[in-house]
């Protein structure tokens, strides 16, 4: 599937083909080129320039192997961006086209264009903006505010409005089912070398399914989440260094608030790499956790329940555990999901995520105590 996707990708299109695709959209000015842009892993992204050489639009080919329901995907994004735009207008904000992504309809008023093989969409380019890759406490505080504000603006979207673009994406019970299937089938004959890790996962399984149980008991509600809360999914103003808007909205869908803070802690507060072979490098950076949480609570306290606030640090452990389970599942299955760069890559990733989980567990009391300020 992945090879098929690569063969089909946007980079294989000629300039004429790309300009013809762009011509299907309601653009407001003439464009002359579309060049590869950014370093996203999922979709193909191109920057589109006008005759003066200014970047005006962003053209994306949607990866329909991952987002199989493109109608739902674009409908979700349309609902979310319109909702945010309305909130910004009500607040009397200026410069709104830089504070929310603006997707352009096709000439027949569709949210995407299908060329017979691929699905395409176009949004306005946000001028004088930049994103960061590294994570500092200062940026984490800004990120917390940005994602808290994002959730806050979307808190009044009624449950049931948005679809799940990747079903069961952060559903721990589902991820454990996949894991148990992998163990049962032992497709790649690797069980013997990962027995200890399997035991560690089983030991924690029940405690890691709290959110699904609380939801069934009516004690936790589903909210609109971003589900990919990385520091590079925010655009900053190049002059003021303040966050303009949150981008990469493909995974915006109903879920639990623990997911968004949890994934930021997992990716941003790790002192090592996600696939660090030297486990001594991998620990939780508590300053990053505190900075993100402080920024997040400034914006999100107004709509969170005491139960949600109390569980936020648990979100970090949950998402790290979930990723450990997913990497190990893929290793046991024979590396069928994640791209690998060496035969043991998924095992190295599993061990690195598990080390981060152990570090988060060691700091659990300190992280829980930090939340008492808001309870």
Regions found by a protein language model. Give the residues of each.
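Long, compositionally biased intrinsically disordered regions
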Residues: 360-363
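Short, Lys/Arg-enriched N-terminal segments with co-localized hydrophobic residues
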Residues: 1-10
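Conserved ATP-binding subdomain of kinase catalytic cores across diverse folds
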Residues: 34-37, 41-177, 257, 273-277, ...
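ATP-dependent phospho-/nucleotidyl transfer catalytic cores
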Residues: 35-39, 60-71, 126-141, 156-226, ...
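Active-site activation/catalytic loop segments of kinase-like enzymes and analogous catalytic loops
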Residues: 254, 258-302, 318-337
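All-alpha amphipathic helical-bundle segments outside canonical DNA-binding/catalytic cores
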Residues: 304-316
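Activation of the activation-loop gatekeeper triad in protein kinase-fold domains
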Residues: 247-252
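Juxta-kinase regulatory segment immediately upstream of eukaryotic protein kinase catalytic domains
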Residues: 11-33
């Amino acid at each position: 599937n992945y090879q098929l996707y690569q063969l089909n990708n946007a980079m294989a299109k000629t300039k004429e083909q790309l300009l013809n695709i762009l011509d299907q959209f309601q653009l407001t000015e003439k464009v002359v080129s579309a060049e590869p842009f950014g370093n996203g892993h999922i979709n193909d992204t191109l920057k589109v320039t006008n005759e003066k050489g200014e970047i005006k639009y962003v053209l994306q080919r949607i990866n329909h192997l991952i987002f199989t329901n493109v109608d739902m995907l674009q409908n979700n994004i349309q609902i979310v961006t319109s909702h945010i735009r309305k909130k910004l207008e009500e607040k009397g904000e200026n410069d709104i086209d830089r504070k929310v992504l603006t997707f352009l309809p096709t000439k027949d008023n569709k949210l995407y264009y299908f060329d017979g093989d691929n699905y395409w969409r176009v949004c306005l380019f946000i001028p004088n903006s930049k994103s960061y890759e590294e994570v500092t406490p200062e940026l984490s505080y800004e990120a917390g505010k940005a994602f808290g504000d994002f959730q806050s603006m979307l808190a009044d979207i009624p449950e049931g409005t948005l679809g799940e673009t990747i079903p069961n994406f952060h559903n721990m019970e589902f991820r454990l089912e996949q894991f148990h299937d992998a163990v049962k089938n032992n497709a790649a004959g690797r069980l013997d070398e990962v027995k200890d890790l399997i035991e560690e996962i089983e030991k924690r399984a029940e405690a890691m399914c709290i959110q699904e149980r609380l939801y069934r008991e009516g004690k936790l509600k589903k909210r609109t989440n971003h589900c990919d809360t990385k520091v590079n999914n925010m655009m900053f103003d190049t002059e003021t260094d303040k966050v303009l808007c949150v981008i990469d909205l493909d995974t915006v869908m109903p879920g639990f608030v623990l997911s968004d803070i949890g994934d930021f802690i997992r990716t941003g507060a790790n002192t090592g790499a996600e696939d660090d072979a030297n486990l001594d490098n991998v620990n939780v950076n508590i300053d990053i956790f505190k900075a993100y949480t402080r920024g997040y609570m400034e914006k999100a306290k107004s709509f969170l329940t005491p139960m949600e606030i109390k569980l936020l640090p648990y979100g970090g452990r949950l998402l790290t555990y979930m990723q450990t389970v997913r990497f190990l599942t893929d290793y046991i299955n024979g590396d069928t999901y994640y791209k690998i760069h060496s035969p043991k890559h998924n095992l190295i990733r599993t061990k690195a995520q598990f080390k981060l989980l152990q570090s988060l567990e060691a700091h659990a009391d300190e992280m829980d105590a930090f939340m008492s300020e808001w309870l």
